[in-house]
Amino acid sequence: MSLKDVKVNFLVDMATDLFMARSISEVTIKDIAIAAQVGEATIYRYFGSKQNIVVHAAMKIQGIVSKDFFNLEKGKNGFEKLKVFYESYYEIFIKHPDFYKFLSEFDAYVSVEDSSITNPYESAIDSYKNFYMDAYELGLKDGSIRKQNDIEMFYFSTTQALLELAKKLAFKKAVLNQDNRIEKTSELQCLIAIILQSLNNLWV
Protein backbone atom coordinates (compact mmCIF):
# COMPACT_ATOMS: atom_id res chain seq x y z
CA MET A 1 0.00 0.00 0.00
CA SER A 2 1.43 3.37 -1.03
CA LEU A 3 1.75 6.37 1.28
CA LYS A 4 -1.05 8.04 -0.67
CA ASP A 5 -3.34 5.05 -0.05
CA VAL A 6 -2.56 5.20 3.67
CA LYS A 7 -3.45 8.90 3.78
CA VAL A 8 -6.64 8.39 1.77
CA ASN A 9 -7.75 5.54 4.04
CA PHE A 10 -7.04 7.64 7.12
CA LEU A 11 -9.11 10.54 5.80
CA VAL A 12 -11.95 8.21 4.85
CA ASP A 13 -11.87 6.73 8.37
CA MET A 14 -12.09 10.21 9.90
CA ALA A 15 -14.91 11.23 7.58
CA THR A 16 -16.86 8.02 8.15
CA ASP A 17 -16.65 8.42 11.93
CA LEU A 18 -18.02 11.96 11.63
CA PHE A 19 -20.82 10.91 9.27
CA MET A 20 -21.83 8.19 11.72
CA ALA A 21 -21.66 10.41 14.80
CA ARG A 22 -23.56 13.30 13.23
CA SER A 23 -24.98 13.13 9.72
CA ILE A 24 -23.71 13.42 6.16
CA SER A 25 -25.46 16.73 5.56
CA GLU A 26 -24.09 18.33 8.75
CA VAL A 27 -20.44 17.36 8.30
CA THR A 28 -18.32 19.78 6.26
CA ILE A 29 -14.92 19.49 4.64
CA LYS A 30 -13.65 21.79 7.39
CA ASP A 31 -14.94 19.37 10.04
CA ILE A 32 -13.12 16.47 8.38
CA ALA A 33 -9.92 18.51 8.08
CA ILE A 34 -10.03 19.46 11.77
CA ALA A 35 -10.65 15.85 12.84
CA ALA A 36 -7.78 14.62 10.68
CA GLN A 37 -5.54 17.56 11.65
CA VAL A 38 -4.87 18.52 8.05
CA GLY A 39 -5.71 21.52 5.91
CA GLU A 40 -8.90 21.67 3.86
CA ALA A 41 -6.73 21.84 0.74
CA THR A 42 -5.45 18.33 1.54
CA ILE A 43 -9.00 16.97 1.53
CA TYR A 44 -9.73 18.59 -1.81
CA ARG A 45 -6.43 17.38 -3.26
CA TYR A 46 -7.25 13.75 -2.50
CA PHE A 47 -11.00 13.74 -3.12
CA GLY A 48 -11.90 16.84 -5.11
CA SER A 49 -15.28 17.24 -3.41
CA LYS A 50 -17.34 16.25 -0.40
CA GLN A 51 -19.44 14.04 -2.68
CA ASN A 52 -16.45 11.86 -3.46
CA ILE A 53 -15.45 11.41 0.16
CA VAL A 54 -19.04 10.45 0.99
CA VAL A 55 -18.90 7.73 -1.68
CA HIS A 56 -15.56 6.55 -0.29
CA ALA A 57 -17.19 6.27 3.13
CA ALA A 58 -20.03 4.23 1.63
CA MET A 59 -17.48 1.95 -0.03
CA LYS A 60 -15.71 1.47 3.29
CA ILE A 61 -18.94 0.43 4.99
CA GLN A 62 -19.81 -1.85 2.07
CA GLY A 63 -16.40 -3.50 2.46
CA ILE A 64 -17.05 -4.19 6.14
CA VAL A 65 -20.47 -5.65 5.34
CA SER A 66 -19.05 -7.81 2.56
CA LYS A 67 -16.28 -9.14 4.82
CA ASP A 68 -18.30 -9.76 7.98
CA PHE A 69 -21.73 -10.73 6.62
CA PHE A 70 -23.39 -12.44 3.63
CA ASN A 71 -21.10 -15.48 3.95
CA LEU A 72 -23.24 -17.76 1.81
CA GLU A 73 -20.66 -20.53 2.04
CA LYS A 74 -22.21 -21.37 5.41
CA GLY A 75 -25.31 -22.74 3.69
CA LYS A 76 -25.39 -26.46 2.84
CA ASN A 77 -27.98 -26.07 0.07
CA GLY A 78 -29.51 -23.29 -2.00
CA PHE A 79 -32.21 -22.43 0.52
CA GLU A 80 -29.80 -22.32 3.45
CA LYS A 81 -27.53 -19.99 1.49
CA LEU A 82 -30.42 -17.60 0.83
CA LYS A 83 -31.40 -17.91 4.49
CA VAL A 84 -27.92 -16.67 5.39
CA PHE A 85 -28.33 -13.90 2.80
CA TYR A 86 -31.59 -12.55 4.22
CA GLU A 87 -30.66 -13.04 7.86
CA SER A 88 -27.55 -10.94 7.24
CA TYR A 89 -29.83 -7.88 7.10
CA TYR A 90 -30.94 -8.70 10.64
CA GLU A 91 -27.40 -9.38 11.87
CA ILE A 92 -26.20 -6.05 10.48
CA PHE A 93 -29.09 -4.29 12.24
CA ILE A 94 -28.15 -5.91 15.55
CA LYS A 95 -24.42 -5.16 15.30
CA HIS A 96 -24.31 -1.99 13.19
CA PRO A 97 -27.67 -0.16 13.11
CA ASP A 98 -25.71 3.00 12.33
CA PHE A 99 -24.86 1.48 8.93
CA TYR A 100 -28.54 1.64 7.98
CA LYS A 101 -28.82 5.19 9.28
CA PHE A 102 -25.83 6.15 7.13
CA LEU A 103 -27.31 4.38 4.11
CA SER A 104 -30.57 6.29 4.49
CA GLU A 105 -28.70 9.59 4.57
CA PHE A 106 -26.43 8.45 1.73
CA ASP A 107 -29.39 7.67 -0.54
CA ALA A 108 -30.91 11.09 0.12
CA TYR A 109 -27.57 12.84 -0.36
CA VAL A 110 -26.58 11.26 -3.67
CA SER A 111 -30.08 11.53 -5.14
CA VAL A 112 -29.40 15.19 -5.91
CA GLU A 113 -25.84 14.66 -7.11
CA ASP A 114 -24.32 13.47 -10.38
CA SER A 115 -25.28 9.79 -10.51
CA SER A 116 -21.93 8.83 -12.04
CA ILE A 117 -20.11 9.40 -8.74
CA THR A 118 -21.85 6.37 -7.23
CA ASN A 119 -20.83 3.97 -10.03
CA PRO A 120 -18.06 2.24 -8.00
CA TYR A 121 -20.43 1.76 -5.07
CA GLU A 122 -23.22 0.41 -7.27
CA SER A 123 -20.82 -2.04 -8.94
CA ALA A 124 -19.84 -3.39 -5.52
CA ILE A 125 -23.49 -3.75 -4.51
CA ASP A 126 -24.26 -5.64 -7.73
CA SER A 127 -21.95 -8.45 -6.58
CA TYR A 128 -24.53 -9.42 -3.94
CA LYS A 129 -27.06 -10.11 -6.67
CA ASN A 130 -24.62 -12.48 -8.38
CA PHE A 131 -24.12 -14.46 -5.15
CA TYR A 132 -27.89 -14.52 -4.65
CA MET A 133 -28.63 -15.82 -8.14
CA ASP A 134 -26.00 -18.55 -7.82
CA ALA A 135 -27.62 -19.71 -4.57
CA TYR A 136 -31.07 -19.59 -6.16
CA GLU A 137 -29.97 -21.74 -9.12
CA LEU A 138 -28.36 -24.21 -6.72
CA GLY A 139 -31.60 -24.36 -4.76
CA LEU A 140 -33.59 -25.17 -7.88
CA LYS A 141 -31.20 -28.01 -8.65
CA ASP A 142 -31.12 -29.49 -5.15
CA GLY A 143 -34.86 -29.04 -4.68
CA SER A 144 -34.63 -26.80 -1.62
CA ILE A 145 -36.04 -23.68 -3.29
CA ARG A 146 -39.46 -23.05 -4.78
CA LYS A 147 -39.24 -21.57 -8.28
CA GLN A 148 -40.29 -17.92 -8.53
CA ASN A 149 -42.07 -16.52 -11.58
CA ASP A 150 -39.65 -13.59 -11.83
CA ILE A 151 -36.63 -14.09 -9.60
CA GLU A 152 -35.09 -10.70 -10.45
CA MET A 153 -38.28 -8.94 -9.39
CA PHE A 154 -38.38 -11.10 -6.26
CA TYR A 155 -34.77 -10.24 -5.45
CA PHE A 156 -35.16 -6.49 -5.89
CA SER A 157 -38.55 -6.34 -4.15
CA THR A 158 -37.50 -8.32 -1.09
CA THR A 159 -34.09 -6.72 -0.61
CA GLN A 160 -35.54 -3.24 -1.06
CA ALA A 161 -38.31 -3.98 1.44
CA LEU A 162 -35.77 -5.18 4.01
CA LEU A 163 -33.48 -2.22 3.40
CA GLU A 164 -36.26 0.33 3.74
CA LEU A 165 -37.58 -1.28 6.93
CA ALA A 166 -34.09 -1.49 8.46
CA LYS A 167 -33.35 2.13 7.55
CA LYS A 168 -36.62 3.26 9.13
CA LEU A 169 -35.98 1.27 12.30
CA ALA A 170 -32.40 2.53 12.56
CA PHE A 171 -33.70 5.96 13.55
CA LYS A 172 -34.39 5.62 17.26
CA LYS A 173 -37.28 8.06 17.54
CA ALA A 174 -40.61 6.39 16.81
CA VAL A 175 -42.68 8.22 14.22
CA LEU A 176 -46.02 6.62 15.11
CA ASN A 177 -47.38 5.29 18.39
CA GLN A 178 -47.55 1.79 16.92
CA ASP A 179 -43.79 1.96 16.36
CA ASN A 180 -43.36 1.98 20.14
CA ARG A 181 -45.44 -1.15 20.58
CA ILE A 182 -43.49 -3.37 18.23
CA GLU A 183 -39.99 -4.60 18.97
CA LYS A 184 -37.76 -3.36 16.15
CA THR A 185 -35.93 -6.64 15.72
CA SER A 186 -39.23 -8.54 15.63
CA GLU A 187 -40.37 -6.54 12.62
CA LEU A 188 -37.26 -7.48 10.68
CA GLN A 189 -37.47 -11.12 11.75
CA CYS A 190 -41.12 -11.29 10.70
CA LEU A 191 -40.42 -9.90 7.23
CA ILE A 192 -37.47 -12.25 6.75
CA ALA A 193 -39.61 -15.23 7.81
CA ILE A 194 -42.28 -14.30 5.26
CA ILE A 195 -39.70 -14.02 2.48
CA LEU A 196 -38.08 -17.34 3.38
CA GLN A 197 -41.44 -19.08 3.51
CA SER A 198 -42.00 -17.97 -0.08
CA LEU A 199 -38.71 -19.58 -1.10
CA ASN A 200 -38.63 -22.73 1.00
CA ASN A 201 -39.57 -25.85 -0.95
CA LEU A 202 -38.97 -28.17 2.00
CA TRP A 203 -41.83 -27.22 4.32
CA VAL A 204 -43.52 -30.31 5.70
Feature-to-residue mapping (PLM):
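Hydrophobic alpha-helical connector segments
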Residues: F70-D98, I151-T158, T185-L188
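Amphipathic alpha-helical linker/stalk segments
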Residues: A57-V84, F99, Y136-E137, K141
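Basic, helix-initiating cap at the start of DNA-binding domains
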Residues: M1-R22, E26-A35, N52-V55
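C-terminal peripheral helix-coil segments that are non-catalytic and often amphipathic
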Residues: E91, N130, D134-D142, F156-V204
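Gram-positive cell-envelope targeting signals
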Residues: E40-R45, Y100, V110-E113, F154-S157, ...
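Amphipathic alpha-helical segments enriched in hydrophobic/aromatic and basic residues
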Residues: F19, T28-I29, G39-E40, K50, ...
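Short secondary-structure transition hinges
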Residues: E91-F131, E152-M153
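Short hydrophobic/aromatic patch on the recognition helix
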Residues: A15, A36-F47
